[in-house]
Amino acid sequence: MICHTYKCIFIHQRKCAGTSIIHAFDLDLSNPDWHFMNDGVLSREYKSAPAGYFRFSIIRNPWDRFVSGWKYLASTRDQSLPDVLARLPRKGADYRHLTRPQHAILYDKHGRLIVDYLMRFESLQRDFDRVCDLIGKPRRVLARDNRGDRSHYADYFDDDTRRMFLRHFGRDVELFGYDY
């Protein structure tokens, strides 16, 4: 999402409260700018991003994000966790919601973070208030859009599924400092 009024770019990570952020900017979703960099297509779009715009995104505990995506997607919600982890989607919306690691769209090919500020899902409102202060936008209470009803992520994992998970998402755990 790009917002020219506040000169900012929000990189939308799936299952990380992105819809709540987009709604907080009251953007016309029919405008093509709202989805600028929305799926982390960084090569061409990143280079053409307006100079001086504040870039931000949200990260989320990788285990919690995965469970949220797993339970959200119609194609996976009725499968067991071991089955989903053994056959992770490799393309399309299911890939973006479930399989793509968070770091894959937040770092460029040289390993540099491409945003100025990383919000944390776990401190969403506080971090959004900070972003608002930095860009000069009046603070606003975020809506809780697309919230699922499920157990705590730790209720789903055992030692085997944790190992399977870390083979694919361990870099997110390491880079963003999350603990199980």
Label each residue range with its predicted role:
Residues 1-180:
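Membrane-interface amphipathic segments in extracytoplasmic regions
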